[in-house]
């Protein structure tokens, strides 16, 4: 084992699943600092994987409780874009299979963009059904953001390719006969809602990036329509667009001047 290079040791550790592996026992006895650093890194990685597994199991408790009652099609529902000054509110409804597993799944806001994009692709592959609901700034202005969010959620459910038997919703109640559970901070407590959060977030971010290409002076691809200093200054200089929510302050005040 002493003749193994550090790079070879690194590759071997990638294959090792547990400490009982004979190769791991040999590497443990290798006193080179480089090898011992790799062994420590392996331990930390396994510890992280275990924590992610425990977190995922904890986030599956709502789904598991429903499945024990014979419920198969459980739709997690979440929204993105209630607060911005521009762009639509986007919701997603996601029905996951019982064997669904993506370690590290969490509220989309707590994930890096790269991780969100990767999870988005994985959810698309694994999900039984995905529905998306999009409500425009004009409708938001007409019926208010709360009602628009509810409408987008109902649209997302209607756009599913299967009929859900139960809805798990992030902090909302929907006017539908489908049984539902409203969960405060559900995107961090339910794998289905978390998956919906990621689908909605990536979908909306892509729309706002397209808007950024159409109106480069507003920087939508950077702030996603939120009321940042850059965005407010752009509105002052270039004016209010159709994509802006005219019922939202300070845009409402700008129009009334």
Curated annotation (Swiss-Prot):
A divalent metal cation binds at residues 78-79, 170. CDD domains: RNase_HII_bacteria_HII_like. It catalyses: Endonucleolytic cleavage to 5'-phosphomonoester. InterPro entries: RNase_HII (IPR022898), RNase_HII/HIII (IPR001352), RNase_HII/HIII_dom (IPR024567), RNaseH-like_sf (IPR012337), RNaseH_sf (IPR036397). Gene3D superfamilies: Ribonuclease H-like superfamily/Ribonuclease H. Pfam families: RNase_HII. Its cofactor is Mn(2+); Mg(2+). It comes from the Bacteria. Its EC number is 3.1.26.4. GO terms for molecular function: manganese ion binding; RNA binding; RNA-DNA hybrid ribonuclease activity. GO terms for cellular component: cytoplasm; ribonuclease H2 complex. Manganese or magnesium. Binds 1 divalent metal ion per monomer in the absence of substrate. May bind a second metal ion after substrate binding. It is found in: Cytoplasm. One of its GO terms (biological process) is DNA replication, removal of RNA primer. Keywords: Cytoplasm, Endonuclease, Hydrolase, Manganese, Metal-binding, Nuclease. Residues 72-257 form the RNase H type-2 domain. Belongs to the RNase HII family. Endonuclease that specifically degrades the RNA of RNA-DNA hybrids. This is Ribonuclease HII. It comes from Bacillus cereus (strain ATCC 14579 / DSM 31 / CCUG 7414 / JCM 2152 / NBRC 15305 / NCIMB 9373 / NCTC 2599 / NRRL B-3711).
């Amino acid at each position: 084992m002493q003749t193994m290079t550090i790079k070879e040791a690194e590759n071997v550790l990638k294959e090792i699943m547990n400490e009982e592996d004979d190769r791991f026992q040999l590497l443990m006895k290798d006193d080179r600092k480089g090898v011992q650093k790799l062994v420590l890194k392996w331990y930390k990685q396994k510890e992280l994987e275990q924590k992610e597994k425990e977190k995922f199991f904890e986030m599956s408790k709502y789904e598991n409780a429903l499945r024990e009652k014979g419920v198969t099609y459980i739709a997690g529902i979440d929204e993105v874009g209630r607060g911005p000054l521009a762009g639509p509110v986007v919701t997603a409804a996601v029905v996951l299979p019982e064997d669904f597993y993506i370690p590290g799944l969490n509220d989309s806001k707590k994930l890096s963009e790269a991780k969100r994009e990767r999870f988005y692709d994985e959810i698309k592959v694994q999900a039984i059904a995905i529905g998306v609901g999009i409500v425009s700034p004009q409708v938001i202005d007409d019926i208010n953001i709360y009602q628009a969010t509810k409408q987008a959620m109902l649209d997302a459910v209607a756009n599913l390719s299967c009929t859900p038997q139960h809805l798990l919703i992030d902090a909302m109640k929907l006017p539908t006969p489908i049984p539902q559970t409203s969960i405060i901070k559900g995107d961090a407590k339910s794998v289905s809602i978390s998956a919906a959060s990621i689908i909605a977030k990536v979908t909306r971010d892509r729309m706002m990036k397209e808007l950024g290409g159409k109106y480069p002076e507003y920087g939508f691809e950077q702030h996603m329509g939120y009321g940042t200093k850059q965005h407010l200054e752009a509105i002052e200089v270039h004016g209010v667009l159709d994509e802006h929510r005219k019922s939202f302050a300070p845009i409402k005040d700008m129009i009334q001047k």
